[in-house]
Amino acid sequence: MDRFDDISEGEVDHSFFDSDFEEARKGDSSSVFDKQDDDAEERTDKDTENVNLKLGLQRKEDDLTEKGTESSGKTPPEEHPVEGDNAQTGNSSSSTTSSRSKLGNARVEHKIHLPTPNSLPQTVKDGEHDYYTDGEESTDDEKKHHVRSKSAKLPNNFKKSLSKKYSRSSSSSSLSLSSSSSDTGCSDTGSDVGLSDSSPSPKKHLPGATHLSPKLKYKPGEKSPGAHASGTKPKVGDDAEESEDTVTDVTPLSTPDISPVQSFELGASSDRKMKVKRQENVRQEVYENVEDLKNNSKSLKSAKKGKEKHEPSLTSKSTALDSSLDHRYKQKVLHDTMDLNHLLKAFLQLDKKRPQKHHFDQPSVAPRKNYSFTREEVRQIDRENQRLLKELSRQAEKPGSKSMIPRSTGPPPKLYHSALNRQREQQRIERENLAFLKRLEAVKPTVGMKRSEQLMDYHRNMGYLSSSPISRRVRSTLSQYSSLKGASRTSSATSGLSCKSERSAFNTTGGGLLLRPKPPNVRTAWL
């Protein structure tokens, strides 16, 4: 209640307004608000002077206000005076001079509707347990809260006005700042009027709840932005910048009810549906076009029929002309086809005649080249040649026909003895060759073809040669064997023969010389 006494005595605390506006300057980040705050301070000084002049009139009306406070303490505050205030504050934006005069009247009306101090602690106990219970401390805190909330709400009003016009933003900001300064100096209900201007809801018109428990405005769940601002901002430790951040993003974000994958699927399905609809529309258009064509054809036919009925003579003449033209065209086509057929037949006949002429001319022309014989003689010669060819082919087919033919001709001719000897010698050579060939074919690889075995054979043969005289034939074979050193199979065969001959020679002489036993490994080539 000290606040009301200070106002009645005509003393205004300018430092309080300066501190409040300095806090508002800290909250405002834009350069536009800095300029407008300077203008607002000058105007608030003028408003305070006007308030000091009008305090004399307000003292006379205190008696009336006390009666009004008693009636308002017993009954709840009505909505009509606040609505009147809203109307007056709304009209104050038209001109600055009219707004100041009306705000003076609004202060008088606010004093009428102020609650009694008896009702203040009751509202504190009922609505809010976190705030102070003393009337003075609670009112001082309320004063700070409302001033901060008002100063925090001003940037939003400025932002809305700046988006429209710069001139309107300057006028509205000056009016709002002047009204806020005058309201804070007179009473706390000025903040309620500002709040009711931004969000006129019936739940906000309880003065006790708005002054002492600002959280109650947020608890009932009001959806207007003014209610959110009044519910979130009036905290003692919060700064102006934090309050601006909380005020800007108040509206709930619209979360999609469908996941992005489903939305893509729905989009694809919608695209398919649109394509199907387009195809159906195209089909319908095609069908409609076909139906239109049919209808047009029917209409044309009906029109032709009507014309034929009205003009039978003309139609008969036209049909006669058409029939004659068709007949002529058909005749031309028939003549053309007949001509083509005749030409094809002629070409085919010529093609058939040409090979026949060649076939008949060949036998007549060929015998004329040989003028030594007549045609009959040539034919007889051909027949004889054909017969001889057949006989020769038959003889060639029979086996042994060549050997039989010379024997059947006659006895063999007589030969001289020299020829006979040559023939016999030749036959003997052939027989030996055949026998040698058979031996070579039957020969298998020998076992003793190693170097050590060949050396043993060589030394043994050399011992045989040095111990007894041997014939020239044996010596020649041994010399050949020693030179070849058993490299070939023929040499091994000759060595075996030489060994046999040596044995036979020793046996015939009857010498008592002892011979080395033949190793069992050594074998002849033909065994």
Swiss-Prot record:
Compositional bias (Polar residues): 183-201, 248-262, 313-322
Region feature (Disordered): 1-322, 393-413, 506-527
Post-translational modification Phosphothreonine, affected residues: 133
Biased composition (Low complexity): 92-101, 168-182
Keyword annotations: Coiled coil, Phosphoprotein
Modified residues (Phosphoserine): 8, 19, 138, 213, 243, 324
Keyword Phosphoprotein in record: yes
InterPro entries: Cfap97/Hemingway, Hmw/CFAP97
Biased composition (Basic and acidic residues): 1-28, 58-69, 270-295
Cystine residue pairs: none
Coiled coil: 273-310, 368-443
Entry similarity comment: Belongs to the CFAP97 family.
The name this protein goes by in its record: Cilia- and flagella-associated protein 97
Protein's organism: Bos taurus
